[in-house]
């Protein structure tokens, strides 16, 4: 049964027994609406997860209709709050909780709470000071990891006047576990950085690994890459030895994430100038915080807010894949990668990377829409059976059982965080059979075991086109629905 919980909730946690006792859970039903569940703080605790159903049984493998995770204690307690839950006297909340203590996960299940009265929101039930609730706060479908969002409220805003390390994490790792498998390593460089703020813009710039200090051309196929110090991923993604066709990632790039800020549902505004250059592409994404539907094959989903391949010319027959084509939308299956993706051609003949544009994602409980410069260009809605109903049965490894336990928008019904970056190559972003300028074919195949090697061997051709490889971001803003 433990394996089922790990698969649904967090594949990276090993459930443990006998070392930590989950304390009593304090549960409150609030008026006119709202729900709270909390446990007292302990120095060893690093995560509190709540899963519950109203008037319906729940097992350890279920994702509840009341669901959330808390990463930080406040006022001596780990408190999960959902201001949109409506309960009445006599309702029964069946639930379980998971607590991570000293890197071990501990489950307390078969719990229930019967609503005997609705409490005032200012009452904490724990003796701590009341938490003020704005009197003008209108309800919203938007949920935060902690705290309450109000309709129309700006819940995140970044203008990149400086780089704020308390808001953004600069990633450093080799994406060995990435489903896209880009041909890069993400590095936090102190000299000639890949991530910088200049002139009021975030600037993320890809570079060649062989031109980094201590590296040469031969390093790519016979050297070692050790970025363990400062690495933001497990150890296997922090070091690599080149061996045969398994070369070092030939491109060094930058990636930042807002892991301190994650949310469910809202409108995201990004004003950006996309990178240009053969075989590079931007990463302007929402990525799943907990990966509760699975961690492989996009099982927990990714939303591409905006992307355009960097090639100024890129075609396959009569189909244009160049920088003139904007694409984006949700991804939730590797085999059927582009099922929900949409595309839009530039209307004035210019490339998307020639100018700044405002890209907008509206993520709601009923649909996902994309806009650019105030014009909606994509809309993705679930079927009666959910978003998974948009996929034929031939799309294997879609976690249909888990998705059916969520809402119709599953897996896009949980907390996601912001990601900004630049990548190159990959096995998903450039279809096989395309040709770039001068009818030059794509140098690798997506299923080939030597894909990265063949990409690097064609470096003289593609690197000459990297005249504007930077992703420039003017601002990012998230507004509650």
Swiss-Prot record:
Stated induction or repression of this protein's expression: By bacterial infection.
Database matches in PROSITE patterns: CBM39, GH16_2
Glycan-carrying positions: 110
CBM39 domain span: 20-120
GO terms of molecular function: carbohydrate binding; hydrolase activity, hydrolyzing O-glycosyl compounds
Signal peptide: 1-18
Subcellular location(s) per record: Secreted
Positions of the GH16 domain: 124-481
InterPro entries reported in the protein's UniProt record: BGBP_N, BGBP_N_sf, ConA-like_dom_sf, GH16, GH16_GRP_C, Glycosyl_Hydrlase_16
Pfam family membership, one: CBM39
Keywords attached to this entry: Glycoprotein, Immunity, Innate immunity, Secreted, Signal
Key word Glycoprotein present: yes
CC terms in the record's Gene Ontology section: extracellular region
CDD domains: GH16_beta_GRP (cd02179)
GO terms under biological process: carbohydrate metabolic process; defense response to bacterium; innate immune response; regulation of innate immune response
Keyword Glycosyltransferase in record: no
PANTHER family: GLYCOSYL HYDROLASE-RELATED, GRAM-NEGATIVE BACTERIA-BINDING PROTEIN 1-RELATED
Function: Involved in the recognition of invading microorganisms. Binds specifically to beta-1,3-glucan and activates the phenoloxidase cascade.
Family in the record: Belongs to the insect beta-1,3-glucan binding protein family.
Name of the protein this chain belongs to: Beta-1,3-glucan-binding protein
């Amino acid at each position: 049964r433990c394996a089922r919980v790990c698969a649904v909730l967090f594949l990276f946690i090993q459930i443990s027994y006998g070392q930590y006792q989950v304390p009593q859970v304090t549960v409150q039903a609030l008026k006119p609406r709202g729900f709270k569940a909390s446990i007292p703080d302990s120095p060893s605790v690093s995560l509190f997860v709540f899963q519950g159903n109203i008037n319906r049984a729940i097992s350890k493998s279920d994702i509840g209709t009341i669901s959330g995770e808390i990463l930080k204690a406040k006022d001596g307690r780990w408190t999960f709050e959902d201001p949109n839950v409506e309960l009445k006297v006599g309702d029964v909340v069946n639930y379980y909780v998971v607590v991570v203590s000293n890197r071990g996960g501990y489950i307390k299940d078969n719990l229930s709470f019967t609503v005997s009265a609705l409490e005032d929101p200012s009452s904490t039930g724990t003796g701590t000071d009341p938490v003020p609730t704005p009197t003008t706060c209108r309800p919203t479908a938007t949920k935060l990891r902690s705290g309450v969002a109000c309709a129309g409220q700006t819940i995140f805003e970044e203008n990149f006047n400086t780089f704020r390390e308390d808001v953004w994490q600069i990633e450093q790792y080799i994406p060995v576990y990435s489903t896209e498998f880009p041909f890069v390593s993400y590095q936090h460089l102190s000299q000639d950085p890949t991530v910088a703020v200049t002139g009021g813009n975030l600037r993320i710039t890809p570079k060649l690994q062989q031109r980094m200090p201590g590296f040469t051309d031969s390093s790519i196929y016979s050297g070692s890459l050790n970025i363990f110090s400062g690495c933001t991923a497990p150890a296997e993604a922090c070091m690599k030895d080149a061996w045969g066709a398994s070369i070092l990632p030939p491109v060094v790039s930058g990636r930042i994430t807002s892991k301190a800020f994650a949310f469910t549902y809202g409108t995201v505004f990004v004003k950006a100038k996309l990178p240009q250059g053969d075989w590079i592409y931007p990463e302007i994404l929402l990525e799943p915080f907990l990966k509760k539907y699975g961690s492989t094959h996009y099982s927990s989903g990714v939303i591409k807010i905006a992307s355009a391949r960097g090639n100024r010319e890129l075609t396959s027959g009569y189909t244009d894949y160049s920088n003139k084509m904007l694409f984006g939308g949700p991804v939730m299956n590797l085999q059927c990668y582009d099922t929900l993706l949409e595309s839009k051609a530039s209307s004035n003949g210019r490339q998307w990377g020639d100018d700044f544009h405002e890209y907008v994602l509206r993520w709601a409980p009923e649909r996902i829409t994309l806009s650019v410069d105030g014009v909606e260009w994509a809309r993705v809605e679930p079927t009666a059976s959910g978003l998974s109903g948009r996929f034929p049965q031939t799309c294997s490894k879609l976690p249909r059982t888990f998705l059916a336990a969520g809402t119709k928008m599953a897996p896009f019904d949980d907390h996601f965080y912001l990601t900004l970056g630049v990548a190159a190559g990959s096995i998903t972003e450039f279809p096989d059979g395309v040709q770039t300028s001068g009818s030059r074919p794509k140098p690798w195949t997506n299923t080939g075991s030597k894909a990265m090697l063949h990409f690097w061997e064609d470096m003289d051709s593609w690197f000459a086109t990297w005249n504007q490889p930077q992703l420039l971001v003017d601002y990012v803003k998230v507004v509650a629905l």
